[in-house]
Amino acid sequence: MLMPKRVKHRKVMRGKMKGNAGRGTTVTFGTYALKALEPAWITSRQIEAARVAMNRFMKRDGKIWIRIFPDKPVTKKPAETRMGSGKGNPEFWVAVVKPGRIMFEAEGVSQEVATEAFRLAAKKLPIKTKFIVRPEHEG
């Protein structure tokens, strides 16, 4: 699963997911892409599940790029613990995804295969997504 090797701060504040994505909104590496239409925290497990679903369908054909990385630690206090006594320990990692962000890219397969692979990947994610074809490859 994806997580940073080392971080400057072990615990971070939750923050707000306002507005649309400022960067990572264009298809850069591949021909096809999966774009987020809603804001969400995508966990490293969800990213991995989507990656596995795409790889299983595409088999050995094509190449996949993961354009998001879970670099935000989410803390959690143990069950049945009284409130107070500090912030909990980091439990899992999330990627902050805003609307318009390209999450996955692929190339080297037909559009039908890519569409189905991204549809399977989208089922593993907790947000609405859209399949995109790079503008110069449409038609």
Swiss-Prot record:
It comes from the Bacteria. It holds the Pfam family Ribosomal_L16. GO terms for cellular component: cytosolic large ribosomal subunit. Keywords: Ribonucleoprotein, Ribosomal protein, RNA-binding, rRNA-binding, tRNA-binding. GO terms for biological process: translation. SUPFAM superfamilies: Ribosomal protein L16p/L10e (SSF54686). One of its GO terms (molecular function) is structural constituent of ribosome. PANTHER family: 50S/60S RIBOSOMAL PROTEIN L16, LARGE RIBOSOMAL SUBUNIT PROTEIN UL16M. Part of the 50S ribosomal subunit. Binds 23S rRNA and is also seen to make contacts with the A and possibly P site tRNAs. Belongs to the universal ribosomal protein uL16 family. This is Large ribosomal subunit protein uL16. The gene is rplP.
